[in-house]
Amino acid sequence: MIIHPKVRGFICTTTHPLGCERNVLEQIAATRARGVRTDGPRKVLVIGASSGYGLASRITAAFGFGADTLGVFFEKPGTASKAGTAGWYNLAAFDKHAKAAGLYSKSINGDAFSDAARAQVIELIKTEMGGQVDLVVYSLASPVRKLPGSGEVKRSALKPIGQTYTATAIDTNKDTIIQASIEPASAQEIEDTVTVMGGQDWELWIDALEGAGVLADGARSVAFSYIGTEITWPIYWHGALGKAKVDLDHTAQRLNARLAKRGGGANVAVLKSVVTQASAAIPVMPLYISMVYKIMKEKGLHEGTIEQLDRLFRERLYREDGQPAQVDDANRLRLDDWELRDDVQGACKALWPQVTTENLFELTDYAGYKHEFLKLFGFERTDVDYDADVETDVKFDCIELA
């Protein structure tokens, strides 16, 4: 079928399979250009592997270090009459090119919060991956979590705490500057956000993997976080989501103490703001990203997801000199260091009050933001003919959980 973008709110409701494949190939090429190392992870599990930082982790492990990878995610496959989600096509492309490179690649499509997903992963590690993994990447960004056992559904809330938050934002449907107000989260919403987005599920995964004996000696685990700056703190770090990320920090400290006994470790990696399906949903982030992209591009500091993950693997987790990674006082790996530079943030703060609907495209990189957003779904690539027919029913080596 012929597919063009249709945007509703902060979601693009259509996806382009070939565009998604080209995006993945671009990330693979960027990774290969930095060389393949053999002194890093060999068997890698990525939980939340289909887009954003999770996908970039899997690409970096496979094509930067020659690792065998197993990915867990929740995506919708395409049919002959309807396109699937972008994540489905991303991983179909990854699987195709990983196998072509002689690498083991297997995927599980289902609820990554479920015990069934953990059981399936453990079985595959035992039967197909040599019995153990040496890196577990936790990269789930879901608004909803169904609790294993009870089946109770919890929802996260992107809300401030204590008082209504009002700030300048972009109405991305109309490309206009607006004042957005968000009511504060209730105590229940805060608690539920911690349950969905905190460290509880990460710990359940490590419990299950360790209990089954499928974590290698020296195994590492990393989960992703964002701290940001005072511009975004009210809605993020000081909001309900921030409470969840603090819980993630506490979880990392517990897991690190456990894994360190066998020569491994666990860390939270704090990453920079990038255009992903997750960040597009957070009020204020599109405007902040549009500003920080412009400033960082001008300073030659810009990184996308693949550059961030490449730096995480090569310069933090698996340093060539064999030294332990540099961490902050909370044992976090900081990849937001360039974004948080005083000159970058000073420029952001100076720019923030100046932006209006009229000068939005001129003063910020909002055009770049929109381009990156549509690219997430396979659109706006110059090497794809969007008026040509494209196959939407794409199959790959993926186990579907019931």
UniProtKB/Swiss-Prot annotation:
Record-listed substrate binding positions: Y226
Sites marked Plays an important role in discriminating NADH against NADPH: E75
Keywords: Fatty acid biosynthesis, Fatty acid metabolism, Lipid biosynthesis, Lipid metabolism, NAD, Oxidoreductase
Binding site for NAD(+): 48-53, 74-75, 111-112, 140-141, 245, 274-276
Enzyme class: oxidoreductase
Top-level lineage group: Bacteria
GO MF annotation: an example: enoyl-[acyl-carrier-protein] reductase (NADH) activity
InterPro entries the UniProt entry points to: Eno_Rdtase_FAD-bd_dom, Enoyl-CoA_Rdtase_cat_dom, FabV-like_NADH_b, Trans-2-enoyl-CoA_reductase
Reaction catalysis annotation: a 2,3-saturated acyl-[ACP] + NAD(+) = a (2E)-enoyl-[ACP] + NADH + H(+)
Keyword Lipid biosynthesis part of the UniProt annotation: yes
Active site, UniProt feature: Y236
A biological process term (GO) from this entry: fatty acid biosynthetic process
Pathway participation: Lipid metabolism; fatty acid biosynthesis
Family per similarity comment: Belongs to the TER reductase family.
Role played: Involved in the final reduction of the elongation cycle of fatty acid synthesis (FAS II). Catalyzes the reduction of a carbon-carbon double bond in an enoyl moiety that is covalently linked to an acyl carrier protein (ACP).
Quaternary structure annotation from Swiss-Prot or TrEMBL: Monomer.
Stated name of the protein: Enoyl-[acyl-carrier-protein] reductase [NADH]
Source organism (scientific name): Xanthomonas euvesicatoria pv. vesicatoria (strain 85-10) (Xanthomonas campestris pv. vesicatoria)
Protein's gene: fabV
